[in-house]
Structures are given as C-alpha cells and as structure tokens.
Design a protein with these regions (language model features):
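Structural helix-boundary/capping segments
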Residues: 1-2, 8-9, 16-32, 94-98, ...
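Short connector loops at secondary-structure junctions
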Residues: 31-49, 80-83
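Short low-complexity, flexible loop/linker segments enriched in glycine and/or proline
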Residues: 47-53, 134-135, 178-181
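Conserved beta-strand edge residues that scaffold enzyme active sites
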Residues: 39-41, 124-125, 169, 212
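Short, Asp-centered acidic motifs that coordinate Mg2+ and/or phosphate
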Residues: 115-117
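Short, basic, helix/turn surface patches
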Residues: 57-72, 146-150, 186-199
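Short helix-loop capping/hinge segments that flank enzyme active sites or metal/cofactor-binding pockets
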Residues: 1-3, 51-108, 120-125, 129-130, ...
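Short, surface-exposed loop/helix-turn segments at secondary-structure junctions
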Residues: 47, 95, 127-149
Length: 215
C-alpha cells in the first residue's frame, strides 16, 4: 500500500480512509498487507511524465494550433500542452526519458518484495459537473489541469498493468472512490485474477447504490 506516496500527493480528506477500509478485503483473501515507500522522488517522475505528455499530446494538437481557423476552437488545456511542447528541446526529452528509466528501476524493485502495489484511483472524490478540474485539494493548489490525477501516472510511466476496482464511498457526501491494483510488467492476467478475487470478497456491497442514490 503506497497511500499518498509518503505525504507527497495532495489527497482530499476521507480518500485514504475509504481506500484503507477496502484494503481489509485483501486480508480476507489471505494476503499480507504492508505500508510501503518508493525509493525515488515522486516529483522527478511527475516532471518526466509532464514533458513526455507535452510532446505526445502536441503531435495531435499542433495541426489545429497552427490553423488560424481552428486555433480558437481548442480548449485552453490542449493549447497549453502544445505550447509547452514547443519550449522543449531534444535534450529535455532525452532527460525526461532517462528519468523515466530511473523511475522504472526504482518501481520494479518494489516487486522484489510485493506481488501487487495498491494506490487510490483518484486524489479527490467526484466533483461538480460544472467544475472543469479541481484547482486545489485541501490547502494545496493544483498547478496544472491534471495534477489532481497524478496518482495514476506511476502505472503509466512503468508500463505496468493496472486495474481500478471500487473501494466504497466516503467524504461528507458519500461519494465513490476506487483503488488501483498494479502488477508486475506483463502480469496482466495476475492483475485480473486479483481484481476478480477482490470483487468476490466484496460481493456484499459492491453492487449497492451509493448513499446519495438510495431511497
């Protein structure tokens, strides 16, 4: 259980409690649970991911950004991704790739000790449909439009199979939350089996409606 990555991630109050309650299902499955810590600065992983994302997204966005008739049709976040990509040099991207490799080595070492790594699926509960994205979580400002989803980049950067399963409902409004089950590289079947076993153990409540929708 990696939780909030040793207090690095901004997490809304109630999220960790909801997820940690769901973790008890793994104990009922016969698994041994431990709190763990990644031996790598998560901010380095974020910086690498952000640069690589700028480059990847820009390949789709730049044709529209360069078209005067379509530029203004792009949402601000898409334009920002492409404009940030234009500031990157080849050296920047090589450094980001090297950082990703360093992160991968540290991440994979965790599987010397564990079969699966568990993280929250999100850093905050569902928010109002009129809110484009959370500008803050607790006292911490989100400095990009996807910073509130930082918790999902680790499976992406490592290339490890990951699945999200329901963790229950939490927070003052009883909103849904999930946990990520992340396995070793190419261990997709193991991850699916773990998710299936989890859902069988959680069968009592997994199909229940959230509190806000109950009669």
């Amino acid at each position: 259980w990696l939780g909030d990555m040793n207090s690095y991630l901004a997490i809304q109050e109630g999220v960790l409690e909801c997820c940690e309650s769901a973790l008890m299902a793994f104990s009922r499955m016969g698994a041994r649970l431990e709190d763990s810590k990644l031996n790598f600065d998560p901010s380095r992983a974020w910086d690498a991911w952000l640069k690589l994302r700028h480059a990847i997204v820009s390949m789709e966005v730049l044709p529209f950004l360069n078209d005067p008739n379509k530029r203004e049709l792009l949402k601000p976040e898409a334009r920002w991704e492409a404009e940030e990509a234009l500031k990157l040099s080849a050296i920047d991207l090589m450094q980001a790739s090297a950082e990703r490799s360093a992160f991968y080595q540290a991440w994979i070492q965790l599987f010397d000790q564990y079969d699966f790594l568990i993280l929250p699926t999100a850093q905050c509960f569902p928010f109002d449909v009129q809110t484009p994205w959370p500008s803050s979580i607790g006292a911490r400002r989100m400095n990009t439009y996807h910073r509130w989803m930082e918790v999902v980049i680790y499976a992406t950067l490592s290339g490890c199979p990951s699945i999200s399963v329901p963790a229950g409902w939490g927070g003052p409004d009883g909103l849904p939350m999930g946990i990520q089950i992340i396995g070793r590289p190419r261990a997709d079947l193991d991850v699916l089996k773990a998710a299936q076993a989890y859902e069988l153990v959680q069968a009592e409540w997994i199909h229940q409606k959230p509190p806000a929708l109950r009669d």
